[in-house]
Amino acid sequence: INPSIASIPHVAAPYLDRLRRHGIPVATSTAPWPPMVRQACLLRNSHPSAAEHLDFVRDEMADFCEKGFWAVLPYAAIAHHPRLRLSPLGCIPQRDRRPRLITNLTFNAVNAETVRLGPSEAMQFGRALQRILFRLRHANPAFGPTYLCKIDISDGFYRIGLAADSAPVLAVALPPMPGEPALVAIPLSLP
């Protein structure tokens, strides 16, 4: 986020500036996971799709680390971090494109245990088509005809940093890589 965000005359400017300075916090509603739960999640590991695309996972994570989006550490180096939670990594093949990595934060209850801190009015997941059609139908005709333009922004990201103490909550167990210890990927920002 650009440092000049604080000077923008908008009600969200102070909030966005705080996120710029401190990162996004991730609060959980449950006690830290005991070591045996973390170990079980590590052993459960990632989705089989990630292991099937092991070379892609390795290259993609190396690229993400180079760009400062993720950090990859040996599990042993972070195993005792009190906020560490592990989610499985998946890899979705896409027709005529390279695969896409996904993190399943629902599998080990990370989503369920995460406190929703964002403003509720910003959380408009689902029913996108219905919302768009409603807006089109109820547009003010005084402004002329309504046009719709669909733009694919899947490769455009606004990366906002995570609060340093929150990043381990969203960690991912990487698939076993030959000759390497168990590895964990920790996001440094949210896409």
Please tell me what each predicted stretch does.
Residues 12, 57-58:
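Generic non-transmembrane alpha-helix signal with a bias for helix starts/N-cap capping motifs
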